[in-house]
Amino acid sequence: MKLSSAFVLSAITVAALGESITTTITATKNGHVYTKTVTQDATFVWAGEGAAVTSAVTEASTVAATSAAAETSVAAETSIVEPSTSAQGTSADEGSGSSITTTITATKNGHVYTKTVTQDATFVWTGEGERAPASTVATVETSVAAETSVAEPSTSAQGTSADEGSGSSITTTITATKNGHVYTKTVTQDATFVWTGEGERAPVSTVATVETAASPVTSVAEPSASTDEGSGSSITTTITATKNGHVYTKTVTQDATFVWTGEGERAPASTVATSSISAIEIPSTTEASIVEASSAVETSSAAETSSAVETSSAVETSSAVETSSAAETSSAAETSSAVETSSAVEISSAVETSAVETSSSSSTIETTSVKSLSPTQTSLSSSVQASSPIETSSAAKTSSVVPTFSSTTTENSSNSKSTSAVVASTTTSSESSATIVTPTRIGQAYTESSSRDAQSVRTHESNNWSSSSSASTKMVSSITRVQTTTAGIFTNGKSSTTPQIVNYTGAADSIAAGTGLMGAALAAVIFL
């Protein structure tokens, strides 16, 4: 209902007579149409609505159409309606002399009221926050479709209405998406509800909700505390709310495993857009130590074929029984048959140092040296076994193994061969580098270097030289072993010192003794 200035003047006269006027008011609020029949005294001033009551006494005492007091009667108006085209001022009535006649709208207990008010151009409707002056004074309506945030905050921007909880309410459905699931909730609130505590506000030119496409949460519901914070995966979401005709946005960062609690009943939607969070699995590089039982057939440069079956256990006290059978053809077209049985009890002690270990991958590289023969002489045969557990890690390790054992050998051979190989090795993360050291024998020294994969098992290393005499029978004896040390710098840039076993000390004396015995035996046979 529009009240003109003339009608207001006549209403004062009617008020003096104690008469009243009955009016039906119709207005639209949030897409809903409200009607109400009001019976009031002609001089009725609607007060008690909080900060918007700027000069109720003025309207009660005077009917000046240019007074801001007339506007007081719409104090319950929510801020969805722009009150006027007036410039922002600091007073309800600057008294500039320039006035504007405007139809303003107010909401009271869920109903919208309209009234025609003539007010000063500098009139400021207080208590409603910042306003953008409108070019027209027609009621600004906000449809429900334009708001995708939670329930309309309030039908009364004042928040101090004397009639809150009067029974007039608005029911709103809130929708939110969380972790690929859609949740809905129905909220019923009083029409005078005021939504506060939303943080920074950014008024925009339109009331349409501003949303971010990447946001998994489309509602204004404030996320609760995560039940699994610190998982390392987070989602940043911009949530939007509409308040008093303005759109406010807020940025929230939450953990990807966030659980939305305290929101009441939830109804997962039938269509669920799955939101998957890809995780990069870091496989474990820790491997169990490898204990290998290997059988290898290897042909040497001197056409030697050997078959070795060995069972070893690294980084522990191990007992190994090795049986080796070899059939050889020498460069002098002589054949030899050697049957060797060695019993070895080996105590391996591995001392490892590493800066940072990320894996434990053990492999055993073993070098076996069998036979130490001299042509036409009875000699000793020794078996040297060096077992080094090789560990692969991100920081190269240096391992040292000192084997100790005794060996007894009986051989018949027409081929003179002196072989001794001791392996000193270390590895990087993918390869092992081994240096085979052979002591000087009869003025000749033999060495060999090789690089191999850390998983390989080397069963036999030997150096051979041709024989120059006929067959001889060898006596069984023991050889004093002297420990020497060989140092080398390998591919990983670290130096390694590995104790070695050299088997030739005292060999000359034994050979001499064997030669004398053989000569006596031969003389006896010839004599017979």
Curated annotation (Swiss-Prot):
Induction context: By iron.
Annotated signal sequence range: 1-18
Residues excised as propeptide: 507-528
Cellular compartment(s): Secreted, Cell wall; Membrane
Compositional bias segments (type: Low complexity): 298-388, 398-435, 462-471
Covalent lipidation (GPI-anchor amidated glycine), chain numbering: G506
GO BP annotation list: siderophore transport
Glycosylation sites: N412, N464, N503
Region (4 X approximate tandem repeats): 20-274
Keywords, in A-Z order: ATP-binding, Cell wall, Glycoprotein, GPI-anchor, Ion transport, Iron, Iron transport, Lipoprotein, Membrane, Nucleotide-binding, Repeat, Secreted, Signal, Transport
GO CC field: cell periphery; extracellular region; fungal-type cell wall; side of membrane
Keyword Transport carried by entry: yes
Domain of life: Eukaryota
Record flagged with keyword Ligase: no
PTM comment, free text: The GPI-anchor is attached to the protein in the endoplasmic reticulum and serves to target the protein to the cell surface. There, the glucosamine-inositol phospholipid moiety is cleaved off and the GPI-modified mannoprotein is covalently attached via its lipidless GPI glycan remnant to the 1,6-beta-glucan of the outer cell wall layer.
Binding-site positions, ATP: G488, I489, F490, T491, N492, G493, K494, S495
Bias-annotated ranges (Polar residues): 81-93, 145-163, 446-457
Recorded topology in the membrane: Lipid-anchor; GPI-anchor
GO MF assignments: ATP binding
Annotated stretches, region: 12 X 6 AA approximate tandem repeats, Ser/Thr-rich: 289-359
Region span, Disordered: 79-100, 145-172, 214-234, 298-471
Function, in words: Involved in the uptake of non-siderophore sources of iron and the siderophores ferrioxamine B and ferrichrome. Has a role in the retention of iron in the cell wall and periplasmic space.
Domain-level remarks: The number of the intragenic tandem repeats varies between different S.cerevisiae strains.
Listed name of the protein: Facilitator of iron transport 1
Organism: Saccharomyces cerevisiae (strain ATCC 204508 / S288c) (Baker's yeast)
